UniProtKB/Swiss-Prot annotation:
Lineage: Bacteria, Bacillati, Chloroflexota, Chloroflexia, Chloroflexales
Summary of the function given for this chain in its UniProt record: Together with its co-chaperonin GroES, plays an essential role in assisting protein folding. The GroEL-GroES system forms a nano-cage that allows encapsulation of the non-native substrate proteins and provides a physical environment optimized to promote and accelerate protein folding.
Keyword GTP-binding: no
Pfam families: Cpn60_TCP1
Keywords, sorted A to Z: ATP-binding, Chaperone, Cytoplasm, Isomerase, Nucleotide-binding
Protein encoded by which gene: groEL1
Catalysis performed (reactions): ATP + H2O + a folded polypeptide = ADP + phosphate + an unfolded polypeptide
Quaternary structure and interacting proteins, as annotated: Forms a cylinder of 14 subunits composed of two heptameric rings stacked back-to-back. Interacts with the co-chaperonin GroES.
Matching Gene3D superfamilies: GroEL, GroEL-like equatorial domain, TCP-1-like chaperonin intermediate domain
EC primary class: isomerase
The protein, known as: Chaperonin GroEL 1
Cellular component annotations (GO), alphabetically ordered: GroEL-GroES complex
GO MF terms held by the record: ATP binding; ATP-dependent protein folding chaperone; isomerase activity; unfolded protein binding
Binding site for ATP: T29, L30, G31, P32, D86, G87, T88, T89, T90, G413, N482, V483, L484, D498
Length: 544
């Protein structure tokens, strides 16, 4: 396939055209006074969104050279979203500002590689300054403020604060669509896993089709149980204490299942058999979690234990076990608190070291089941487009809140970026072009506040000058401009706060992508082929 090439200034200008097209569409959504963007879908109603990364992901340009610039900028937005879950519009605005100023000085003869080195050194200093100014999340009010800022909706902010308070910072919160028009919340207490009862005959509540056992003894094994002889010794010991007996195993079938069902129908034993959750190594880990939560032992041949060797001491205990045909919940396991805490710390350590997003998600779920709980936020709306837009905002706000709990918060409204600018004065560089890179960063860091003000119909330069003057007069670095009220004041006190993780990720990713664009000297793409005109079908235009 033949290629076409652009070099030097022509190449960089083509990239900039692509960057500008994406950034100009995305930055209209910045801030509480930002506008929505409607995205056409080939089928169904258009998507109306206030989310920067959703807008960026939809953009594909016809010109292949411009499209390269667009895709690079999308990478800055997407990476920020992946790491912090929010801040995509800020990253896009910063990257565009750096590219715009950088291309001017490169065209004037500056060395692009030295410029990039200055940008990279500056970014390191900025990230350190942003982290140093962090304030930990103190209470529910801080969480509500972070979520409200992200979603531009106080109802969503209060909802997320309430749910997070209930399940704890290690809890799992998922967002689903609801059939109604309002928000709904669902909580799951205890440990729930997605395996239900093996036989419908085990149901204790016919109306709700649930099997509910109080204070049961729980046998946990990774084996398949087919013969009743394997569990008869432990069954006889359990019956001396209680009738309530739960089996969590790879499977229970054949004679073993038939005997349990018959004896349940006779009233001899109230048995519940459930398949073990997960597969492979994950199943072993989850069974171990259940064992620690309930104070039992996993009976496994891997550790030299057979089912007929199980004793009462090997069985777990819980206040209640409830099973439906789809899932099982263990409420108030009687496990040792110290052992549960040790297991939680072990899972946290695994989360910190894993590189796989899938593994991290599964570990987070296990952690939530042991440590906190599971909550579902159901989003409702009158129409389909509004529902999707609302769900996006709830997901963004949730990500921003988690990021805030993790690394702390800084003043929002673009103030944290302006406050970080003096950190660039301490960066030592050897070459003049590196200093130019630092100068570009100084100008770019003001851009988010300029755009926030512009979206609110104000003059960005005047707002920035007033913010700096008031900060100096009052000796308060948290002072900024509230675009909703049109008033100056402490951003922290007004609840206008951003997570540190979001702010630093936006800076890092914007500098990374802008540096790549500024140091590009050639672009290569395929020459589009002219498609031959379609030939008319056989017998076209003839009468028969």
């Amino acid at each position: 396939m033949p290629k076409q090439l652009y070099f030097n200034e022509e190449a960089r200008r083509a990239l900039k055209r692509g960057v500008d097209l994406v950034a100009d569409a995305v930055k209209t959504t910045l801030g509480p006074r930002g506008r929505n963007v409607a995205i056409d879908k080939k089928f169904g109603s258009p998507t109306v969104t206030h989310d920067g990364v959703t807008v960026a992901k939809e953009i594909e340009l016809k010109d292949p050279f411009e499209n390269m610039g667009a895709q690079l900028l999308k990478e800055a937005a997407t990476k920020t979203n992946d790491v912090a879950g929010d801040g995509t519009t800020t990253a896009t605005v910063l990257a565009q500002a750096i590219v715009t100023e950088g291309l001017k000085v490169v065209a004037a003869g500056a060395n692009a590689m030295l410029l990039k080195r200055g940008l990279d050194r500056g970014a390191e200093a900025l990230v350190a300054a942003i982290k140093a100014s962090a304030v930990p999340v103190r209470d529910r009010a801080d969480i509500a403020h972070v979520a409200t800022n992200s979603a531009a909706d106080s109802e969503i902010g209060e909802l997320i604060a309430e749910v997070m308070e209930k399940v704890g910072k290690d809890g799992v919160i998922t967002v689903e669509e609801s059939k109604g028009v309002t928000f709904e919340k669902e909580y799951t207490e205890g440990m729930q896993f997605d395996r239900g009862y093996i036989s419908g005959y085990m149901v204790t509540n016919v109306e709700r089709q649930e099997a509910e056992l109080d204070e049961p003894y729980i046998l946990i094994t990774d084996k398949k149980i087919s013969s009743i002889q394997e569990i008869l010794p432990v069954l006889e010991k359990v019956l001396q204490v209680t009738k309530n007996f739960v089996i969590i195993a790879e499977d229970v079938d054949g004679e073993a299942l038939a005997t349990l069902v018959v004896n349940k129908l006779r009233g001899t034993i109230n048995a519940l058999a459930v398949k073990a959750p997960g597969f492979g190594d994950r199943r072993k880990a989850m069974l171990q979690d259940i064992a620690i939560l309930t104070g039992g032992t996993v009976i496994s041949e891997e550790i030299g234990r057979k089912l007929d060797s199980a004793t009462i001491e090997d069985l777990g205990r819980a206040r209640k076990v409830i099973a439906t045909k789809d899932d099982t919940t263990i409420i108030e396991g009687r496990g040792d608190e110290a052992a549960i805490r040790a297991r939680i710390e072990q899972i946290r350590a695994q989360i910190a070291t894993t590189t796989s997003d899938f593994d991290r998600e599964k570990l987070q779920e296990r952690l939530a089941k042991l440590a906190g709980g599971v909550a579902v936020i159901k989003v409702g709306a009158a129409t389909e487009p509004e529902l999707k837009e609302k769900k996006h905002r709830v997901e963004d706000a949730l990500s921003a809140t988690r990021a805030a709990v993790e690394e702390g918060i800084v003043p929002g409204g673009g103030v944290a970026l302006i406050n970080a600018i003096p950190a660039l004065d301490n960066v030592q560089v050897a070459h003049e072009d590196e200093k130019v890179g630092l100068q570009i960063l100084r100008r770019a860091l003001e851009e988010p506040l300029r755009i926030l003000a512009r979206n609110a119909g104000e003059d960005g330069s005047v707002i920035i000058a007033n913010v700096r003057r008031l900060q100096e007069e009052k000796g308060d670095k948290t002072i900024g401009y509230n675009v909703l009220t049109g008033q100056y004041g402490s951003m922290i006190e007004q609840g206008i706060i951003d997570p540190v993780k979001v702010t630093r990720s936006a800076v890092q990713n914007a500098v990374s992508i802008a540096g790549m664009i500024l140091t590009t000297e050639a672009l290569i793409t395929d020459i589009p082929e002219d498609k031959p005109a379609a030939t008319p079908g056989a017998g076209g235009g003839m009468d028969f």
